[in-house]
């Protein structure tokens, strides 16, 4: 099935999840027979089709039901301005107003976040909307959150730090709104349309280039690796998750870990060189989460490598083994959501 959504969707597209598909009609030009519209999570469908999210916004605007835009009128969709194109050109208080709509499917508990994958296009939209606003044509962005329980929205500074800092930089130039919607089993739009809170102070505190991180490494075959002071270690075939932290320059630390060519310093450098692939999952935070991450991973892992990455702390290890890819494991995804999103509820 064709999936018109550029996100990672790790927490949604897990094995066994129910997908809502529509058959592509003859002559549609699509070589794939189906298009994915939604996926079920916790008994409710979550809209995946990003183009349909714009149709939802258009319908709410026409009915005067989009919070913050009740009196506005759509002049046209896909409005061009210079080198940019925006989802809507509105008539707002007698003036033109550019509006971008972003579809948000990442949430846990009360908090929703966007984006779930790096979006250079989204960052560019924010920057150019702010330029137009400073030149006299106001604009804004609406994050359409497909969650029935979320009451708070934050940019996903774990996944796209640059987008998140850009949103903070332009928030005083633009109208920034987050709106919650929900869907029925027949994919009809539910009656509740909610204005979500955006806690700018908390975002400013947490969206910093510091915190913890997880590295997911694949070993396609068993092999013995010389790990510095630990000596030779037999790594069995499978996946390994390493928990680390950086009090400053987290982005550069993660980029260094992802590179193969470097001067080896930490235990993880030796394993990264031997691994077939490596995926980084930052967990930006104003508090030290490294040891809590390691403890939680230890409860999920199928084995561990003693003393790995733990020479300067009381933890038994910071490296944990899994037979299958943990990013496809609902329990690992729940752990990631808990540290990235749900723990922030305590600060609301």
What residues fall within each predicted segment?
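Acidic-basic catalytic patches of nuclease active cores, encompassing PD-(D/E)XK
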Residues: 10, 42-75
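Flexible glycine-rich surface loops and low-complexity tracts that mediate binding to linear polymers
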Residues: 15-27, 181
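Aromatic/basic micro-patches that form nucleic-acid/chromatin recognition or nuclease catalytic surfaces
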Residues: 173-176, 205, 248-333
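Beta-strand/loop nucleic-acid-binding surfaces
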Residues: 1-10
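Non-catalytic C-terminal interaction segments of nucleic acid-processing enzymes
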Residues: 138-140, 144-146, 151-209, 214
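OB-fold/S1-family single-stranded nucleic acid-binding modules
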Residues: 28-46, 190-192
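GIY-YIG nuclease catalytic motif and its immediate N-terminal context
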Residues: 195-262, 281-288, 327-348
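Conserved catalytic cores of phosphodiester-cleaving nucleases, focusing on short active-site segments
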Residues: 86-116, 129
């Amino acid at each position: 099935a064709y999936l018109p959504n550029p996100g990672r969707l790790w927490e949604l597209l897990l094995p066994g999840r129910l997908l809502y598909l529509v058959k592509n009609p003859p002559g549609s030009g699509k070589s794939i027979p189906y298009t994915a519209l939604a996926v079920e999570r916790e008994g409710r469908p979550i809209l995946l089709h990003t183009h349909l999210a714009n149709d939802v916004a258009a319908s709410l605007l026409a009915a005067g039901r989009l919070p913050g835009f009740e009196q506005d009128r759509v002049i046209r969709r896909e409005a061009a301005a210079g080198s940019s194109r925006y989802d809507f050109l509105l008539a707002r208080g007698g003036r033109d107003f550019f509006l971008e709509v972003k579809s948000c499917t990442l949430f846990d508990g009360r908090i929703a976040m966007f984006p779930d994958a790096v979006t250079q296009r989204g960052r560019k939209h924010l920057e150019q909307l702010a330029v137009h606003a400073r030149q006299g044509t106001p604009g804004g962005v609406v994050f359409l959150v497909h969650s029935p329980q979320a009451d708070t929205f934050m940019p996903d500074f774990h996944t796209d730090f640059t987008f998140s800092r850009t949103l903070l930089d332009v928030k005083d130039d633009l109208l920034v709104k987050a709106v919650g919607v929900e869907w029925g089993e027949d994919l009809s739009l539910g009656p509740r349309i909610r204005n979500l809170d955006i806690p700018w102070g908390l975002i400013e505190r947490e969206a910093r280039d510091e915190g913890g991180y997880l590295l997911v490494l694949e070993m396609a075959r068993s092999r013995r690796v010389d790990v510095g002071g630990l000596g030779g270690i037999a790594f069995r075939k499978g996946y390994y998750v390493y928990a680390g932290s950086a009090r400053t320059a987290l982005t550069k630390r993660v980029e260094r870990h992802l590179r193969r060519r470097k001067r080896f310093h930490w235990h993880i450098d030796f394993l990264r060189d031997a691994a077939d692939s490596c995926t980084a999952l930052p967990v930006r935070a104003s508090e030290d989460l490294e040891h809590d991450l390691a403890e939680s991973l230890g409860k999920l892992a199928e084995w561990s490598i003693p003393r790995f990455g733990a020479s300067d702390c009381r933890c038994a290890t910071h490296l944990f083994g899994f037979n299958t890819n943990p990013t496809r494991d609902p329990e690992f995804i729940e752990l990631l959501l808990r540290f990235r999103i749900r723990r922030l509820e305590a600060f609301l």
